[in-house]
Amino acid sequence: MLKVDKLSKEFKMHIRDGLVIEGFSDVTFTAYDGKLLAITGASGIGKSTLLKCIYRTYKPTEGSVVYSKMDGTDVNLVKADDQTILKLRKTEIGYISQFLSVIPRVSALDILTNRLSAKSSPETELRNMAEYYLNKVGISKTLWNMYPSTFSGGEKQRLNILLALAAKPKLLLLDEPTASLDIKSKEIIFELILDAKKSGTTMVGVFHDKDAIKALADGRFDMFENKLVAV
């Protein structure tokens, strides 16, 4: 479970004489295990900034983000030290951005096998699992040993989503995960996300895709004038 309480983010522009730009303010919501909470709203309103504050890419200005860990204890992600945040990102908290970011000159199969290594299974088993997942999302076998930089936009995004879901995070943050996918690819990703929900993963996602909201969301908030409103 994730409890966000009175969360705010401001950006202070030191090169602009201390100009303060509001990202969002006074955001409060609870996301439950096995549920997906959708965040909607106009572009540039602060939705992605909110996700980045939860993930701690940005440090919130005010408020708290209390996350219930796998071991049953709670941690305030706003106040947690960097070491704790990095450990949680590696083992429990996933983030799907709009762009694939991976180690260059490493094959898709090796990248996914490495991501699965947290399962502490034998190398052969991990590789078989990686092949299974790549096949499941419709990435051609001829691409498995290729660098993701050579993939099409849709193939990159399918791999991007797969890397996050295959690690089976307890909390998953999604920033427009289906933005560049065709209908068939969307259906595959919908299935993976629904499977993750069934396994208990808590999800908070930014969406513009109405089909995705209808298929996946258990609740929805709309961001308007930098504030979050239940829909």
For each of these PLM feature ranges, what is it?
Residues 164-165:
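ABC ATPase C-loop
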Residues 124-142:
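Conserved ABC ATPase "signature" region
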Residues 55:
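Helix-to-loop junction immediately C-terminal to a conserved catalytic motif
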Residues 99, 106-117:
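Q-loop/switch helix immediately C-terminal to the Walker
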Residues 64-87:
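ABC ATPase NBD Q-loop/coupling interface
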Residues 147-151, 155:
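Conserved ABC ATPase signature
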Residues 40-42:
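The feature captures the beta-strand-to-loop junction immediately N-terminal to the Walker
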